[in-house]
């Protein structure tokens, strides 16, 4: 086994990653495979925080007649459903896990308290952050960047459907070029599809590297933590 490159990581998963080929809902086989990969990190002594999107359950569209704020709050509830599903998969493997939500849901999760989250991580517990930032108009990418800064994570592991960052959509263009490394400024200036601009700026301001990789094989989570060059790293350069 290689040497761990990071001590504390923030894993950002899209809600669609949990849906698998169904495109909607939760594929519990996929949730379990992700949980197994996270367990490997915990067994290696790595402290893991996680943020899951909600797009497999709800994709709010203010343009379809719904109030944007209401749609965003519904999305926060969707992320909390995903957080509980991932917690269940992890705990079935014996991984001590806590869900903390930015909106109080005391019957099912702890409220987000930074000091408590840090203490859980130090004790080897996985902490899953639900309900985004608790505020409308902010994405779960921004929530991941914010929580990563607050818990002093060494890196954000950004699991996507593609194996890195490209200059254009590799599913549409055969000549799409993959980047091995990028600076935050390059991502922002070129409008590259990594995180949204708010999240990218937050990572830049706090010098948090973003490691983009494909989740088609959950083993990739361990591989990137061990330093394998299988994705794109976004940093100050």
Curated annotation (Swiss-Prot):
Which parts of the sequence bind UMP? Answer: 54, 72, 133-140
Residue ranges that the Swiss-Prot or TrEMBL entry lists as coiled coil: none
- GO biological process terms held by the UniProt record: 'de novo' CTP biosynthetic process; UDP biosynthetic process
Catalyzed reaction equations: UMP + ATP = UDP + ADP
Q: Which Pfam families match?
A: AA_kinase (PF00696)
Q: What does this protein do?
A: Catalyzes the reversible phosphorylation of UMP to UDP.
Protein name per Swiss-Prot or TrEMBL: Uridylate kinase
What is the species of this protein? Clostridium perfringens (strain 13 / Type A)
Origin organism lineage = Bacteria, Bacillati, Bacillota, Clostridia, Eubacteriales
